[in-house]
Amino acid sequence: MAKTMPKKDVVVIGFGWTGAIISKELTEAGLNVLALERGPMQDTDPDGVYPQTMDELTFNSRKKLFVDVSKETVTIRHTSADTALPNRQLGAFLPGNGVGGAGLHWSGVHFRVDPMELRMRSHYEERYGKKFIPEGMTIQDFGVTYDELEPHFDFAEKVFGTSGTAYTVKGEKVGAGKGGNPFAPDRSSDFPLPAQMNSVSAMLYGKAAESVGYHPYNMPSANTSGPYTNPYGAQMGPCNFCGFCSGYACYMYSKASPNVNILPALRLDPRFELRTLCQVTRINLAADGKTATGVTYIDASGNEVIQPADIVAVCSFQFNNVRLMLLSGIGKPYDPESNTGTVGKNFAFQNMATIKVFFGKDQHHTNNFIGAGGNGIAVDDFNADNFDHGPAGFVGGSPFWVNQAGAKPIAGTPTAPGTPNWGSGWKKGVAEAYTHNVSMDAHGAHQSYRANYLSLDPTYKDAYGNPLLRMTFDWQPNDIRMNLFMQDKMSAIAKAMGGQAISISGKKEGSHFDTNSYQTTHLNGGAIMGTDPGTSAVNRYLQ
């Protein structure tokens, strides 16, 4: 029989960035907040201390900080006509687990949204006409504007200790010719810290980008360029470019995370409680089916526990938020055949391409073992709608950047085209390329489509007997057209760098989604916000 705990004002499901932020906001409002985290307690000390945290085999290859896919995963198929199978080996994306969630192992790249992308359908219809949006593409406006969100972006950067170079502040140009982004929207204040130093790779890239007419700028980075104390009193140390960011906890307290930037303040508040190893299985509803009354979870001993609360904040990873809504009977499940329902609708990912430039050993020493997760130089000339999409014939844009995050000895061993895949020739190629290459990425936007959606799997279940989430997803023609376009535009920078060889990794005509090729962990949609309950799962306040 399930044990019922004393009622709380608020129960928060998941303690990553969203859970930490909402917990801090609501405790400051005077509410008693309980956060439930499915994974273990994690903190810089003892879990991320030097030198243990700089262990590529444990954290990257064996994925210590990520979700255990033997217990909980998603099933994947390309189309509704296919049979989905469980994803038992992480590859295309890396959901986090434990206190901090994916916010503990992220890199620290910290952009703001482009104002246009918050009203994307309206913008494209106004500029290019309704027929420009392909049939089956289901993009819609968010129901909020950049101006409404700007004060919150500003405060978040102060909490994160973000390093960067503003271009305009309150309409005044302050970063022209100094590394600011001429395409960036206006800001109410500058970044809390100046931009980090740039790597040799980034400087070579920036010079080449400028030579072909693009507009390079310093990437905003949630890796500190100097000592910093945030508004909550959390202290951060300056980044030392150790190269162990993405997939790791930062032993220098330099990378923003819920663990470093918010949890220290929450621990001092008696109104806050954090329980770990608590797997939430249901959001409990009142008899009206519309009011949340709390949650049911499985504790570390395997006992079922009911936690009543006046407010339930669903703050777990994107996949799990959608799954919990479906398991709990919240909202109407999306049906792609009739294009009705909202929960599971508009699932989207990211559309990546990578180009590597290989130099001769007497050209440039790029020292790729040096790095910071969010640091680098980017161009936005082909991001958002900063260019004419009409002749290009697709929806979406992409920034290009060089973000030298630190090449590790197991995975960070690229070789130039033509190098043997094994043996002495491969070893020679690795040695020649390791500190003589530059890698650049197009982090392309990915649109939502009627054919791509999330639902409950009818066959496979998790360790607790609940249906797994099923991901129906594949690249669409618009994605491939955009990716090929971005490869071409980014190649201009690569060629201008004057290397001896170039390799391109991106989509081709007929490409399908591949679970082995890492894209990012930027998974979106499924419980989308908006102003129309007929097309959105939650309102503009995420209720």
What label would you give each PLM region?
Residues 78-95, 99-102, 106, 112-121, ...:
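FAD cofactor-binding and catalytic pocket of flavoenzymes
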Residues 40-65, 96-107:
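Conserved N-terminal glycine-rich FAD pyrophosphate-binding loop of Rossmann-like flavoproteins
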Residues 1-7:
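A short, basic/flexible loop-to-alpha-helix module at the beginning of a structural domain
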Residues 25-26, 30-34, 40-46, 113-117, ...:
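A generic secondary-structure signal for well-formed alpha-helical elements
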Residues 28, 32, 39-56, 261, ...:
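Glycine-rich loop(s) and the adjacent beta-strand/alpha-helix scaffold that form part
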Residues 8-35:
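N-terminal Rossmann-like FAD-binding beta1-loop-alpha1 element of flavoenzymes
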